[in-house]
């Protein structure tokens, strides 16, 4: 199996261990295998600050304003890191494909499956001979298992986007996070016949408890390089411009087959956006692949 690291770390050769950094564990383990959690320097620093503040309160009670101020600042920094979807401060986060991907890009499609939109998206992908990664919601997969089966049958990958896509996901504690993610893992494995290797948080928002949970479940966090905001924007041209501005090799793109915005004709915007993006990618010799094919090729059949 080739071992690769995110864009934020130096390229390594197969069989080597990448160096530790804020976005890569000291001992890299490919997606699909449980790994030992190692807190990032940012999380370690925050924990040390908490210990220092507590020690200060015991030794010098008069310095309580400093201690409280330090704790508030630390908590605000942790919250800010969780509200930044592409941040690597809280742990490993794939924001781009590894260097070994060459001129490949990853098209990721979130919040489905949707019985109206997903089949039409699959038809478009077939037309352009493109492969995509579908981050599916467990509850929706249970309601529309035929869509999940079609995704896999047509050569695409199904990954974990939580069981219920809870809007308070980033506020959950470790046990609730694990229940939510593990439930989706079981649901999607049962329906697709393949165990998800990657997880994407609802809206990309998370907290420091997420990375240890993903380590136990053998999942890696994946966000994106650029997104179109196609659940809010009804103008397909504007969505396309956001996705294509600066598009290059190894980019991870985000669009939606679930809850897509609709244009003036009441058509899902994504159906107008995809042909433009796929044609532009082909014109610049960029080929769409799945996350697992680019990052964990040895685990494609996991």
Annotate each PLM feature.
Residues 2-8, 12, 16-17, 22-94:
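N-terminal membrane-anchoring alpha-helices
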Residues 82-169, 180-183, 187:
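Active-site beta->alpha N-cap acidic-glycine motif
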Residues 109-111, 136-138, 160-162, 200-203, ...:
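A cross-domain feature marking catalytic cores of carbohydrate-active enzymes
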Residues 112-116, 136-144, 167-175, 200-208, ...:
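Acidic-and-aromatic substrate-binding clefts and catalytic sites of carbohydrate-active enzymes
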Residues 205, 211-247, 286-297:
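His/Asp/Glu-enriched short active-site or ligand-binding loop at hydrolase and phosphoryl-transfer sites
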